[in-house]
């Protein structure tokens, strides 16, 4: 027991939630994890522990790159907008992050590179040529999640190329049955490419020991044992250009796979927090011999990455491992998978438009335990439970006593506390409730609290202050009865403070005192409270109906946008940009097209679209300005061959003379491609 961190005088904890992907909105499924973690974090703070609670957006990968292209903006612009939306949603639910960052940050780039280079130095990185699925229409290698097909194990259809949502199996996309490109719908072809691998099997003995440490949930430990029995495989940590992410140090057109730098995002976000504050030391929390505690809250769909790859990467690069990984199940609504058509796929922002976030915090807490069970948000039960527990049992306890204290005793509680034994029974429950909060058995903690609320209301019912108030000479008895009721309410709200922080804050204003775990040891006597105001409103079923309807409208709008995008895919380039009127051959022959080699390319200061080129056209050098800055970095173009209009009249521009035109194709923005001749063409050759 002496080594149990729960019994240390004061603890230092670093707590994380899984990083939401930066290409979509937060929904009520996400909120389960963030509410669960926030309750645990708030409980730890309430007990005097030091907690740093961090998160970030997972901002890399092909899905983000492609979606940004569809939107006609840069990936950086897209992830910035999504981050703002995510943080607003989490703030709306009172998720008390100390820092919210992005994996697309300098801190994360430096840490990812450092960890990779340490792993490489220590012999845990190797490379080999692999055959990989390639989209022949889009001319790009396909990431795992952009290949869909039939699971090779359970034969479920429409599964992603890295793992099966149905059976949880992980596999290579080349193992999928009947694979299709999720980008174009084309059947992928095999193409060779050099990839880099993390040697996970070297860490098997360490991972087995970590699994047997006794801290992991039994379901997680059992699942890991299955993976050990089936054999650990080397992990492909690289992806080919084009890709939105971090380039691998020392390699060209090779990028870190998003799942390598995503968990490092925990470190990056904490590093960012350390840079903002003078009282935090990054090494104290991440050194191999750290005495602090590290906990990850995640969903069951990403256990493989967090229980195998992540601790192995940390071990191999000289960092500490997590104390535990807390895994939760999925959210269902009304007993079924969340459905956009039924309006039960509810965005966090849509919920906040219609309902109090404290209601969902309470309901999730009432149904959460330490196991990996799915949680059903039954909307009828949700309404009944919140109204019955929070409004009728707990808040009503204050309202039915506060009026008498305000009207008859000028807001002052009795000097004498009439029911010390009853009060001590409520206070004695603190240890049991604390154990349940610590163990993430929130549902059991809520049952303990509501059972106490029943006892408190029973006391008030039996004493009937509304009757005593009518009897002469019983003012002291009335004051004492109501003071007991309000003090019992104070204890209950202290226990509920991690679950319902906004209600707790209103309670503190009403009681004119902060709610603290230690403070409830003694009741309030002779204490002045403020005039009672409504602390909490019951759920109106009409608001739930409005939320469902709004979710249906959101889904319909998304579907319309998706159909429009799909229609755009089938639209031909000719239909978008019809062929111009015919011209005579002699007219065309007047245009002198020449092969040119790009000698140098540089950005033009204060020009948003232009790149400045020096072109070799075979014995002559031309200066040309071209508006393709949005599609290319200057260093990518130097040394390439291209095609230019050589006899175009020179044009004087603000930034200099342009002596021709480089030919490029595409709709604009990042979708522009310069024309490149086949090998063998030489600068100065005429294009016929």
UniProtKB/Swiss-Prot annotation:
InterPro entries cross-referenced by the UniProt entry: aa-tRNA-synth_I_CS, Anticodon_Met, Met-tRNA-synth_bsu_C, Met-tRNA_ligase_1, Met-tRNA_synth, Methionyl/Leucyl_tRNA_Synth, MetRS_core, MetRS_Zn
Residue ranges of domain tRNA-binding in the record: 587-688
Residues annotated as binding ATP: 340
Catalytic function, reaction form: tRNA(Met) + L-methionine + ATP = L-methionyl-tRNA(Met) + AMP + diphosphate
Coiled coil: none
Record-listed E.C. numbers: 6.1.1.10
Reported cofactor(s): Zn(2+)
One GO term describing the cellular component: cytosol
Chief place where the protein resides: cytoplasm
GO BP field: methionyl-tRNA aminoacylation
The protein, known as: Methionine--tRNA ligase
Organism taxonomic ancestry: Bacteria, Pseudomonadati, Pseudomonadota, Gammaproteobacteria, Vibrionales
